[in-house]
């Protein structure tokens, strides 16, 4: 009786582990303002991170333009050091649903 209960418990545990939902990220393939990049995408199972790439920021007066970004799902997101000098584009990674909305 105990072994039958244990088998049922294992089957339920195995089933529930396989039912996890994929990560959801905001995505936009083309660079656009941060406020405009709001498409929600269910990522592939191998994607483990949401990635935001900062493409440009206005560097001249009046400094009121929104940042231009791309956002995507990523299976191997490698963030750039925000203090790095000369980086072509800053890359930010996060690891929960819809976490890449800021910037």
Swiss-Prot record:
Q: What is this protein called?
A: Secreted Ly-6/uPAR-related protein 1
Role noted for this protein? Has an antitumor activity. Was found to be a marker of late differentiation of the skin. Implicated in maintaining the physiological and structural integrity of the keratinocyte layers of the skin. In vitro down-regulates keratinocyte proliferation; the function may involve the proposed role as modulator of nicotinic acetylcholine receptors (nAChRs) activity. In vitro inhibits alpha-7-dependent nAChR currents in an allosteric manner. In T cells may be involved in regulation of intracellular Ca(2+) signaling. Seems to have an immunomodulatory function in the cornea.
Implicated in which disease? Mal de Meleda: A rare autosomal recessive skin disorder, characterized by diffuse transgressive palmoplantar keratoderma with keratotic lesions extending onto the dorsa of the hands and the feet (transgrediens). Patients may have hyperhidrosis. Other features include perioral erythema, lichenoid plaques on the knees and the elbows, and nail abnormalities.
What binding partners and quaternary form does the record give?
Answer: Homodimer. Interacts with PLAU. Interacts with CHRNA7.
* Protein's GO biological process: cell activation; cell adhesion; locomotory behavior; negative regulation of cell migration; negative regulation of cell population proliferation; negative regulation of keratinocyte proliferation; neuromuscular process controlling posture; urokinase plasminogen activator signaling pathway
Signal peptide location: 1-22
What phylogenetic lineage does the species belong to?
A: Eukaryota, Metazoa, Chordata, Craniata, Vertebrata
Q: In which tissues is it expressed?
A: Granulocytes. Expressed in skin. Predominantly expressed in the granular layer of skin, notably the acrosyringium. Identified in several biological fluids such as sweat, saliva, tears, plasma and urine.
Task: Give, from the UniProt record, the effect of changing residue 82 to S.
Answer: In MDM; uncertain significance; no effect on secretion
InterPro entries named in the record: Ly-6/neurotoxin-like_GPI-ap, LY6_UPA_recep-like, Snake_toxin-like_sf
SUPFAM superfamilies xrefs: Snake toxin-like
- Return the GO cellular component terms, semicolon-separated: extracellular exosome; extracellular region; extracellular space
- Classify the main location: secreted
The reported result of mutating residue 77 to R is: In MDM; decreased secretion
Select a single GO molecular function from the record's annotations and give it: acetylcholine receptor activator activity
Q: Where in the cell is it found?
A: Secreted
Q: Does the keyword ATP-binding apply?
A: no
User: Which segments constitute the UPAR/Ly6 domain?
Assistant: 24-73
Tell me what induces its expression: Regulated by retinoic acid, EGF and IFNG/IFN-gamma. Down-regulated by IL-13 in cultured human bronchial epithelial cells (related to asthmatic condition).
Q: Which cysteines bridge via disulfide bonds?
A: 25-50, 28-37, 43-73, 77-93, 94-99
Output the Gene3D superfamilies linked to this UniProt entry: CD59
For this UniProt record, the keywords arranged alphabetically read as follows: Cytokine, Disease variant, Disulfide bond, Palmoplantar keratoderma, Secreted, Signal
